[in-house]
């Protein structure tokens, strides 16, 4: 009887230990995945920033300001490099429809000899930034990086709101660049 009780107690301790170890491993994996998600979000934030610059410069160039072409080429190369760096995360991003949309939009924007109007290209690039923001939002919500799905007023969720507000400013800057380029190239102002 004592031996049976001792064996039962030993089995119970082993099961509890295995359960605690599995729980600890699960937490560790989740924390590791969350760190990877943060690295992805940092990279996507850089990509958003460069796409916004690309949008403003390309709208300015297409509106007639040829002095911006060298800067546009440089930013275009940076955007290409950032998309290339995102390939590391492709297995994780593959499941996000917004990422696929972003890739398709970049291909359309980056086509040489695009016969698109400046306004249509501006719209495509704005859609591209929105797709990237949606990708960031999906990652943030999946790994609980925003409190209560952005409903909480705590600072933990404000970073995502800040990205959306920066995009509104970026749209305004792009339009302003185009307007300035158009007015500068008018014969009568």
Show which residues each predicted segment covers.
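Hydrophobic alpha-helical segments
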Residues: 2-189
